[in-house]
């Protein structure tokens, strides 16, 4: 029965949805990808959030252009996490982005694919994230690598509250070291409303009319990587 379910076609995509960069190497843990954008959009739109985060380590497989099966979606999100909506401050969002980009240009499962916001990582600034012996966030002890954080086209206000959609692993359990979140530090507005792969299916079927189209052909320029040598969006820098 499960085999039949996995083969069931749930939607279509006109573009290949990928975890890889232009060079064919895995990128979702260190750069924006079109599948990362899609997964983050699904959380933000379905939960009605200002911002959504998806950890790159939770985006596990590509989807080739053509039919999308239930199995394809499960392969993308195989962990069975559940969608949550929480209230956080701009400072918590900024600290999360800083933790997510701490390992860059190296990979991190906690690298954040985002929706509803854009930001720049300045790779020339060394990370000053302090972690405890469990690799959990403690504080930022120096200059931030992340800047130009815009939410819905407006500069992030560290003192303002925003609604943030993601899964229980990050928002409630403070997974991947995201101790600025966790049940002690966030106000839960919607608690484990839907399993992660269903979030993705529902977004494509209900909000995109069952077809992932050209708007997801390439990364949408949400994350810009800045170095002394370049000042281009991540999807462009892959080609240099």
Spans of features found by a protein language model:
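Catalytic centers of hydrolytic enzymes
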Residues: 1-240
């Amino acid at each position: 029965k499960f085999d039949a379910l996995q083969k069931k076609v749930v939607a279509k995509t006109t573009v290949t949805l990928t975890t890889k960069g232009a060079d064919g190497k895995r990128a979702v843990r260190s750069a924006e990808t079109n599948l990362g954008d899609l997964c983050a959009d699904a959380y933000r739109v379905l939960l009605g959030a200002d911002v959504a985060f998806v950890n790159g380590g939770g985006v596990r497989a590509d989807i080739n252009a053509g039919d999308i099966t239930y199995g394809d979606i499960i392969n993308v999100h195989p962990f069975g996490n559940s969608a949550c909506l929480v209230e956080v401050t701009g400072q918590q969002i900024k600290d999360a982005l800083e933790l997510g980009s701490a390992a860059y240009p190296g990979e991190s499962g906690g690298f954040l694919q985002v929706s509803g916001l854009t930001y720049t990582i300045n790779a020339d600034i060394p990370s000053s994230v302090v972690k405890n012996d469990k690799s959990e966030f403690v504080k930022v002890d120096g200059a931030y690598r992340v800047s130009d954080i815009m939410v819905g086209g407006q500069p992030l206000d560290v003192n303002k509250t925003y609604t943030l959609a993601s899964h229980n692993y990050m928002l409630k359990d403070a997974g991947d070291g995201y101790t600025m979140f966790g049940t002690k530090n966030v106000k839960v507005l919607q608690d484990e409303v839907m399993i992660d792969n269903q979030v993705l299916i529902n977004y494509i079927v209900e909000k995109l009319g069952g077809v992932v189209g050209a708007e997801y052909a390439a990364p949408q320029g949400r994350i810009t990587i800045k170095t002394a040598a370049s000042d281009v969006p991540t999807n462009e820098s892959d080609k240099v």
